[in-house]
Amino acid sequence: MPFALRYHPAVRGDDLPLIDRKTRERIRGAIEERLRTAPHEYGEPLRKTLKGYWKLRVGDYRVVFKVIKSDVLILGIRHRKSVYTDISTRLQP
């Protein structure tokens, strides 16, 4: 059963415009191929403040997501140097 992909509004507004087109297509392909079919097999669980969330590595970029039943909520796509601090600010109320 394929998972439905949902994106945080900041992914399209803030994250994707910062990534060059070739890398963006590579990330999109990885999301479609891996997260839509088996997110727990391809992703790695995060710890500490991001416990309950997962990451998918695509080159120097990280896709941070959460699996909720049959949905995959993608919270951010950022360079590995800044992804975790940027995502943590999105989770604060």
Predicted feature locations:
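Residue-level recognition of oxygen-bearing side chains
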Residues: 10, 51, 82
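Active-site micro-motifs of SAM-dependent methyltransferase domains
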Residues: 13, 37, 82
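A short, surface-exposed loop/turn module that caps and links secondary-structure elements
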Residues: 32-57, 85
